[in-house]
Amino acid sequence: MLKLFSAFRKDKIWDFDGGIHPPEMKTQSNGTPLRQVPLAPRFVIPLKQHIGAEGELCVSVGDRVLRGQALTRGRGRMLPVHAPTSGTVIAIAPHSTAHPSALAELSVIIDADGEDRWIEREGWSDYRAHSREALIERIHQYGVAGLGGAGFPTGVKLQGGGDKITTLIINAAECEPYITADDRLMQDCAAQIVEGIRILAHILQPREVLIGIEDNKPQAISMLRAVLADAHDISLRVIPTKYPSGGAKQLTQILTGKQVPHGGRSSDIGVLMQNVGTAYAVKRAVVDGEPITERVVTLTGEAVSRPGNVWARLGTPVRHLLNDAGFCPSADQMVIMGGPLMGFTLPWLDVPVVKITNCLLAPSVTEMGAPQEEKSCIRCSACADACPADLLPQQLYWFSKGQQHDKATAHHIADCIECGACAWVCPSNIPLVQYFRQEKAEINAIRLEEKRAAEAKARFEARQARLEREKAVRLARHKSAAVQPAAKDQDAIAAALARVKEKQAQATQPVVIQAGSLPDNSAVIAAREARKAQARAKQAAHPVADSALPGDDPRKAAVEAAIARAKARKQEQQAGSEPAEPVDPRKAAVEAAIARAKARKQEQQAGSEPVEAVDPRKAAVEAAIARAKARKQEQQAGGEPAEAVDPRKAAVEAAIARAKARKQEQQAGSEPAEPAAPRKAAVEAAIARAKARKQEQQAGSEPAEAVDPRKAAVAAAIARVQAKKAAQQQVVNED
């Protein structure tokens, strides 16, 4: 009884909610065997014929290629594409592709040479001798993708399944009206399909392998049963005809009774599904070593005279295939790629056949019927009853039309399989699937933009963190460089420190000052006082300071000379006589200096106290006052003003007179007041100059060039400084 119950459960099938039963038009094309189509003169191969990114080009314009040669490299989800025939690459440029809007995608354009030569093929007849990874890599590099319509890379799908897969399902339902590509392939190539299924089972190692096929394909069912007569590892399940039984989620529920969760995949419940056409392509890639370069395409519709299924090379223009089938277009002829429910109308016929192209439908006007006008929704809920995904198409329609993306997402619009059952039953002729496709495209665009923004933010934050780390490292490096000198500078620094220590050792012992106490400067103070006492003793023993004597002031002498000249002029004016030759101020200054020297000598002999030194500034002021008074008296007398007395010249002459007086004193045996070595030379030079000028004036000759009073004053000052310096040096030597 238990075995009978297990056998009953083994063949049990389930059902799904919703679904429709449209009229079938499969008999138009499934009655004739597969046939080859003549090669087109030109092929357009889009680089992206699958879900994922396009591969990297490995050919260039002008290259000659062979059939099966890779045109791109595949990494990750990038699936390579291959040349459908031998020929020459004439262009690599964007070209319109199989898309409702005929979007242009980068394509390789090849001119066929008609030879159709293959690359060197290497098949793995004993595929069991190769590892699972090697088989998956071969399937991927040979460009095998899901041929049922999704176009997902088969190698990536097998790799992602891993050890989670317990059930492998082969989809042979082909529920779409008009399409018979899989039906005809199973009738003509059943053995190759089963071999491909066994390769997939060898890779995945599932517990069971199920083939699901609708009961409207009796010839295909009989062919598969004949091939599987002795097989116990593959089970054939015949299911009732119902649209859309061929959907992945619907067929999974029919064969296993399990439902794929919202937003999930069939692999989440241990199920992996492949199409019969994909199984056939896997067999050719692994066993025969042939990349996918062609597929079965159904050519049907009342607008073609020879409907059927053909082997169409990838990249063949749609126009070329339809012309081979006897295409007779009408005035407003449409061509649908895919079935009447899930397909889309082509904008023009120059688009190429790609891996997901399974049908080209060219219906007549009577076959499709007149286009119906879209009306308002009457809320009849017929769409909800027909939806196989348990969605609410009415609500999704309002959300899509009102651009309410959040609500549409919350109502699981992503689970819509776009089967078209809702639009088929809608009494208002609302193209619901078009609204849903547009809404999903907008949601995907928003998510893509959000993803890009998040990636940009992550890059910015990573950059900021990197800059902060670099700044911290840079500051630490600068800090360590400032604190710790480089290794190569250690020797130089050590040598400098050694020299400093050596100098400190040779120098006198430094004064050490204790913290909180005053320095002991008693020794320095005592030495300074001793030097001062010694200097005072020397000054008392040798009174030198000639300039300190009252009569030694040149300015006072100049004042006296000016006063003498003024008195002389006044006496002359009172006598009424003509003024004689003006009194020479230099001579008067010399006489005054001689008089002062004599008076000084008498004072020294008498032992009197020295007179207080005359302030030179005060003497200069008095001299200036005397000169001003003399000029005023001259002006009052009406006489010509005498020559202005130059105080600097008078000072020089006074210095000369003092020098003569000292010389006379020294000759008379008196004690010299100060050494005359340098001063004597300066005085003699000044005397010589004065005598020369005096002789010139007495001879009545032309007056010589006037002596610059500033130069004379400077010379006299230099002479005095030199004399004082010599006197001080002599005192030091005597000590």
Swiss-Prot record:
It comes from the Bacteria. [4Fe-4S] cluster 2 binds at residues 387, 416, 419, 422. It is a peripheral membrane protein. [4Fe-4S] cluster 1 binds at residues 377, 380, 383, 426. It is found in: Cell inner membrane. Residues 666-689 have a biased composition (Low complexity). Its EC number is 7.-.-.-. It is an enzyme of class 7 (translocase). GO terms for biological process: electron transport chain. GO terms for cellular component: plasma membrane. One of its GO terms (molecular function) is metal ion binding. Gene3D superfamilies: 3.30.70.20, NADH-ubiquinone oxidoreductase 51kDa subunit (3.40.50.11540). InterPro entries: 4Fe4S_Fe-S-bd, 4Fe4S_Fe_S_CS, Ion_transpt_RnfC/RsxC, Nuo51_FMN-bd, Nuo51_FMN-bd_sf, RnfC_N, Soluble_ligand-bd. Residues 534-715 are annotated as: Disordered. Belongs to the 4Fe4S bacterial-type ferredoxin family. RnfC subfamily. Part of a membrane-bound complex that couples electron transfer with translocation of ions across the membrane. Required to maintain the reduced state of SoxR. The complex is composed of six subunits: RsxA, RsxB, RsxC, RsxD, RsxE and RsxG. NCBIfam families: PRK05035.1, rnfC. PANTHER family: ION-TRANSLOCATING OXIDOREDUCTASE COMPLEX SUBUNIT C. This is Ion-translocating oxidoreductase complex subunit C. It comes from Salmonella paratyphi B (strain ATCC BAA-1250 / SPB7).
